[in-house]
Design a protein with these regions (language model features):
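Conserved catalytic/coupling modules of large nucleotide/cofactor-utilizing molecular machines
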Residues: 17-152
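Short, well-ordered alpha-helical segments
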Residues: 12-16
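Hydrophobic "lid/gating" helix adjacent to the active-site nucleophile
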Residues: 5-8
Length: 152
């Protein structure tokens, strides 16, 4: 599982399910039959696309949290459960992603104001990450245009 998560990552997300399935098969059948599931998994993992971009992104995000410490949650993301919270601006201008065109509120950020916007995940040109990069590049361009249209 560690090899799958760190070394293959989102280049081939199916590999994680396959690793869990091989483990489950071995647990159910034992040796020697269950070993065949691991053998097939090893062959698959050895021959599939590799990427540690997700792993690197996770580590960078953790490093930023360690460095910056606890930051304030942006007001628009705070739950306005009481009248006082509403008066303080909690939840103001919050955009529900599910209601936005395309399912993503493009001009909304989830980062604390003190941190500013960050990009952690930079997909590599291998496996499924090729498509993920195309999608993220498109979303980032659309986000920039949406923010420019609102003067942000």
């Amino acid at each position: 599982m560690l090899f799958r998560s760190e070394d293959i990552g989102l280049a081939d997300p199916r590999a994680q399910s396959m690793a869990l399935e091989a483990w489950d098969i071995y647990e159910r059948l034992g040796s020697p039959e269950g070993e065949l599931a691991f053998a097939q998994l090893v062959l698959y993992l050895a021959s599939t696309a590799k990427s540690n971009a997700g792993y690197a992104a996770f580590n960078q995000a953790k490093a930023d949290v360690r460095e910056s410490g606890t930051e304030e949650v942006p007001l628009h993301l705070r739950n306005a459960a009481t009248k006082l919270m509403k008066e303080l601006g909690y939840g103001a201008e919050y955009q529900y992603d599910h209601d936005a065109e395309g399912g993503i509120a493009l001009d909304q950020t989830g980062f604390p104001d003190a941190m500013g916007e960050r990009v952690y995940y930079n997909p590599v040109p291998r496996g499924l990450e090729i498509k993920l990069k195309e999608k993220l590049d498109r979303l980032r361009a659309e986000r920039e245009a949406a923010r420019a249209a609102k003067g942000r």
